[in-house]
């Protein structure tokens, strides 16, 4: 089962070829592989990591906007990072060993992967692809009919956007062939946004430093998303490939989605190839309830790693949310209109889930209270010093860095139009949301999900449009790019990365530098490519929804709240409280009765778009794993795990391959979420 997959010639025979291949000098140092020390966060690992981060940001932006193909960096699954990491281990690392006698060791590979998953949270749905259209979109889509010129434009801070109509028109409709991007017009708002988002990233990393030991050492959260990269990064002295890639079950699992997606991809070019229909949608109760029954292979593979109670909780509460929302529609009853980013759930379902997330964060902070108090006391020099040598930042830096970054962020938000109190409420709500989603990703390993109610939307719900005023409502809308469509963000990806760093024993302080460089390089490279593509093709001609639906949805939301203020949404807050109470009861049952079969963490996910797309795949994985454990036991689970990990690689590998083919062939195949 674990036989050598392939045997290569000896590296010593052709090592001199490496001198002719400059790229592989990053690997080679003339030292035989057996004598190369474990480097960890080495200069060559960081250099290769930055190259991969740049390739990831350029490839994701071009693939989504121009090719209109599969999004590979839109969720915590970080498909782009996995594909690049897979190629690095399958092709580039063995080739480097062949040519130079040296290869990246497991710790260096971990460094590269951590940098990539952090970078994957930035270029598309994470931030930049959402931000660029906002720099001029509220002006481009203003019409006499929507009257944004009078209701919104006077309240937009000048330093947040570009008001030059020619520059905006060229961003959305394209410039003349060969005309360069007028960076002097765009640098002012871009600089303001970059300073702000870096402060947000830094503050969340500081929070993560303060919580890491509690989550990893005290509570021992599982971090299932770290499993596949750790398996890929395992090395044996005499083996060219890791054990996972020498297991035939891995390649059988790989072949299932790879062949099926390959046939569908060929069908898009050659009609004589059959099309395998994977989509299935069932409606009942007068079309008030709809079930999306499409299996997604990458979700099935990743969900196999979840514990049965967690996967049961995810699909069970999703199914209950479907029924709840459907019955409300059937009866024609609702506590209010649908809200951005919460649909297809009704507002009552969304706010119950949001209340559950609030309790999840409260319970997490409460269980960590002694550790957090000790961290703060140690940071201010009033308590017993705590060993923080394993953290990417010292506790003193984390505590005071969080405070400084928070002050900067709140002041920045207040300058956009929010009052100081509203800015503080909104900022803390975002931090709570980040902690909640990072906890879900770390504990449950679920790679897909967003906040049940977006922080800007909940701020309006809790404070009311009258308190916020037109300037505050406009400011909240302008902050949609980083705080509304939270399909991925840096904190959760870094949490997975820190687990990988703990297992591989990376040098923590040097890792922080690598992460910071990855963030900076990705921000710059993704901004450059998206601006360049927008001027070359015209934003409205590109894929994604940033230049179209996102900007228009946000403008309509701002205008509606300004022109039709409804006060504090009382029933929404009541359902939020009900969700917190239900989560508390389920948490008590789970802790009081060890055999309680459903994990309440699924309640905090609600029924947002990602959950509506993956719940059935989670159900399939839960059913398969339950049957395997029942009849094969733990041995059967371990035996078949490579099959499911291979399925993840095959799904993302096929998506990446067809993205490259479509970039040349002109068609658009979308295989990811």
Task: Map each language-model feature to its residues.
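Aromatic (phenylalanine/tyrosine) cluster motif
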Residues: 8, 23-24
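Helix-loop-helix junctions within the multi-pass membrane cores of secondary transporters/permeases
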Residues: 224-237, 492-504, 508-510, 515-526, ...
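Short hydrophobic alpha-helical segments enriched in small aliphatic residues
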Residues: 3, 11-13, 19
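Catalytic alpha/beta core of large soluble enzyme barrels
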Residues: 556, 561-644, 657, 663-664, ...
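Transmembrane-helix bundle segments that line or gate the permeation/cavity pathway
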Residues: 47-403, 408-480, 487-488, 526-547, ...
């Amino acid at each position: 089962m674990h036989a050598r997959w392939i045997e290569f010639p000896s590296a010593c025979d052709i090592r001199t070829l490496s001198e002719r291949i400059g790229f592989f000098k990053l690997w080679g140092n003339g030292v035989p592989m057996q004598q190369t020390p474990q480097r960890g966060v080495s200069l060559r690992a960081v250099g290769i990591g930055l190259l991969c981060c740049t390739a990831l940001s350029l490839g994701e932006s071009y693939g989504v906007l121009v090719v209109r193909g599969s999004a590979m960096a839109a969720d915590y699954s970080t498909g782009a990072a996995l594909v690049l990491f897979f190629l690095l281990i399958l092709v580039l690392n063995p080739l480097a060993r062949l040519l130079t006698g040296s290869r990246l060791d497991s710790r260096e590979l971990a460094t590269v992967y951590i940098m990539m998953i952090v970078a994957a949270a930035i270029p598309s749905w994470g931030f930049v692809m959402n931000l660029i259209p906002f720099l001029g979109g509220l002006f481009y889509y203003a019409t006499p009919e929507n009257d944004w010129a009078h209701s919104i434009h006077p309240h937009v801070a000048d330093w947040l956007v570009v008001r030059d109509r020619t520059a905006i028109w060229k961003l959305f409709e394209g410039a003349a062939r060969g005309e360069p991007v007028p960076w002097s017009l765009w640098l002012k708002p871009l600089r303001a946004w970059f300073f702000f988002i870096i402060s947000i990233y830094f503050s969340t990393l500081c929070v993560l430093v303060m919580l890491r030991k509690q989550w990893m050492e005290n509570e021992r959260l599982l971090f299932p998303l770290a499993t596949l990269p750790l398996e890929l990064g395992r090395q044996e002295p005499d083996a060219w490939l890791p054990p996972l890639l020498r297991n035939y079950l891995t390649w059988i699992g790989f072949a299932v989605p790879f062949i099926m997606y390959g046939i569908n991809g060929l069908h898009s070019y050659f009609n004589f190839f059959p099309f395998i229909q994977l989509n299935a949608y069932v409606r009942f109760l007068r079309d008030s309830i709809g079930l999306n029954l499409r299996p997604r292979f990458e979700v099935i593979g990743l969900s196999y790693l979840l514990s049965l109670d967690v996967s049961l909780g995810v699909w069970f509460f999703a199914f209950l949310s479907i029924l709840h929302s459907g019955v409300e529609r059937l009866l024609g009853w609702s506590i209010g209109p649908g809200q951005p980013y919460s649909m297809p759930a009704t507002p009552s379902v969304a706010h119950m889930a949001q209340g559950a997330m609030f309790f999840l964060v409260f319970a997490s902070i409460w269980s960590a209270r002694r550790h957090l108090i000790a961290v703060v006391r140690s940071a201010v020099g009033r308590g017993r010093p705590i060993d923080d040598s394993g953290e990417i930042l010292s506790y003193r830096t984390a505590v005071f860095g969080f405070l400084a970054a928070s002050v900067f962020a709140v002041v920045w938000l207040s300058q956009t139009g929010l009052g100081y109190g509203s800015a503080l409420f909104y900022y803390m709500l975002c931090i709570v949301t980040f902690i909640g989603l990072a906890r879900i990703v770390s504990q449950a390993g679920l790679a897909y999900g967003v906040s049940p109610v977006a922080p800007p939307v909940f701020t309006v719900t809790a404070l009311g449009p009258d308190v916020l005023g037109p300037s505050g409502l406009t400011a909240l809308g302008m902050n949609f790019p980083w705080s509304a469509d939270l399909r991925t963000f840096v904190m959760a990806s870094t949490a997975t990365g820190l687990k990988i760093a703990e297992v591989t024993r990376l040098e923590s302080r040097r890792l922080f530098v690598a992460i910071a460089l990855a963030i900076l390089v990705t921000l710059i490279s993704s901004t450059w490519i998206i601006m360049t593509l927008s001027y070359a093709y015209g934003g409205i001609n590109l894929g994604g929804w940033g230049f179209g639906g996102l900007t228009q949805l946000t403008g309509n939301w701002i205008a509606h709240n300004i022109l039709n203020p409804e006060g504090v949404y009382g029933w929404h807050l009541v359902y939020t409280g009900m969700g917190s109470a239900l989560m508390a009861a389920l948490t008590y049952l789970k802790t009081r009765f060890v055999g309680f079969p459903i994990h309440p963490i699924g309640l905090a996910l609600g029924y947002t778009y990602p959950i509506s797309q993956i719940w059935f795949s989670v159900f399939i994985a839960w059913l398969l794993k339950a049957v395997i454990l029942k009849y094969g036991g733990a041995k059967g689970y371990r035996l078949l795990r490579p099959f499911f990990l291979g399925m993840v690689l095959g799904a993302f590998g096929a998506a990446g391959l067809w993205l490259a083919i479509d970039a040349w062939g002109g068609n658009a195949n979308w295989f990811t979420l």
